Amino acid sequence: MTTENFGFKVLARDGAARQGEISMPRGVVRTPAFMPVGTAGTVKAMYMDQVKELGADIILGNTYHLMLRPGAERVARLGGLHEFGGWKGPILTDSGGFQVMSLAQLRKLNEHGVTFRSHIDGKAYEMTPERSIEIQGLLDSDIQMQLDECVALPSPEKNTERAMELSLRWAERCKVAFGDQPGKAMFGIVQGGDIARLRERSAEALKAMDLKGYSVGGLAVGEPQEVMLDMLEVVCPILPTEKPRYLMGVGTPDDILKSVARGIDMFDCVMPTRAGRHGLAFTRFGKVNLRNARHAEDHRPLDPQSDCPASRDYSRAYLHHLVKSGEALGAMLLTWNNLAYYQYLMKGIRAAIADGKFSDFTAETTEGWARGDMPAL
């Protein structure tokens, strides 16, 4: 049930995996949760009603993109991001920091914040911890992120430590700027690259700030999966058990299964939507590339057992035709399929944890991927 305050409850455990609920005034988020990415106020190639019907309880908006276009103040005048974009449930916004570090031009970073030029028109902006929280407040998101500095991996240890310590100081400033908002939350972001002692230092310091939730950032940025999982094994035991844990920017279905097993509750990634726009489908059989000629005369659907019309009601031959022809409907149908599969996976994960059968579910799911797609006709 919805509540006036922000709250998190663990309902079941299976090893380190947790099944629970995040309660907010705008709705309940069932965890483990996958958040479709609505970068600029839209989950690309999807209607918001479709996203909801697939089982998503929460979506993500991107502070950097929204502050540049249409502008946070304009969104506020139009009633906030929920009203503006037609999504009535909870919304999480990132701080904009990752995009500033990776997309923006001519960055200048110091203790106060970061100045940069828009990748769209070259206009100069300044992002500080206080301004990031102000923008997220104008967007009226339900869960907000601290501003942090995310370094690309591999990174020299000295630079990684400097960025981590700066992010901790920025977390303190974000906490002050956020203040007391009972129905909302600000999450701190654990940084430290691929260095265990830095991750420990970051997690311990953020834990001491007694925030409402905790994110793990700076992973899934090109490092091997084993490194990401090693860092989760360092961080998750430190973070409070009664607070939600969010792994930012992750990831593949396999990443999700292995991260849930280490105690992560929330995920987001552009992968299912981006892959759909490039002809790639996620299914119970693993990844299926609809560009391949083997599908050109295949009358079978992607997955006859799926509840999603895109997966069940359209032939592989038709999807292949749409993708090869560059038709917009191809991107729409494959994005629909992919988000349906991700939510199907999360639903299965939650049920398996509740039943104490998460390891069995993981084994069955990975065996399905390993068997591969149905044989070609």
UniProtKB/Swiss-Prot annotation:
Molecular functions (GO terms): tRNA-guanosine(34) queuine transglycosylase activity
PANTHER family, per the entry: QUEUINE TRNA-RIBOSYLTRANSFERASE (PTHR46499:SF1)
Keyword Transferase: yes
Listed Gene3D superfamilies: Queuine tRNA-ribosyltransferase-like
Domain of life of the organism encoding this protein: Bacteria
Metabolic or biological pathway: tRNA modification; tRNA-queuosine biosynthesis
Name used for this protein in its record: Queuine tRNA-ribosyltransferase
Span list, region RNA binding: 249-255, 273-277
Keyword check for Glycosyltransferase: yes
Subunit structure and binding partners: Homodimer. Within each dimer, one monomer is responsible for RNA recognition and catalysis, while the other monomer binds to the replacement base PreQ1.
Active site: D94, D268
Gene transcribed to yield this protein: tgt
Reaction(s) catalysed (UniProt annotation): 7-aminomethyl-7-carbaguanine + guanosine(34) in tRNA = 7-aminomethyl-7-carbaguanosine(34) in tRNA + guanine
Any Pfam family hit: TGT
Similarity comment: family membership: Belongs to the queuine tRNA-ribosyltransferase family.
Source species taxonomy: Bacteria, Pseudomonadati, Pseudomonadota, Alphaproteobacteria, Hyphomicrobiales
Keywords: Glycosyltransferase, Queuosine biosynthesis, Transferase, tRNA processing
Binding site for substrate: D94, S95, G96, G97, F98, D148, Q191, G218
GO CC annotation terms, alphabetical: cytosol
GO biological process: queuosine biosynthetic process; tRNA wobble guanine modification; tRNA-guanine transglycosylation
Function, in words: Catalyzes the base-exchange of a guanine (G) residue with the queuine precursor 7-aminomethyl-7-deazaguanine (PreQ1) at position 34 (anticodon wobble position) in tRNAs with GU(N) anticodons (tRNA-Asp, -Asn, -His and -Tyr). Catalysis occurs through a double-displacement mechanism. The nucleophile active site attacks the C1' of nucleotide 34 to detach the guanine base from the RNA, forming a covalent enzyme-RNA intermediate. The proton acceptor active site deprotonates the incoming PreQ1, allowing a nucleophilic attack on the C1' of the ribose to form the product.
Enzyme nomenclature, EC number: 2.4.2.29
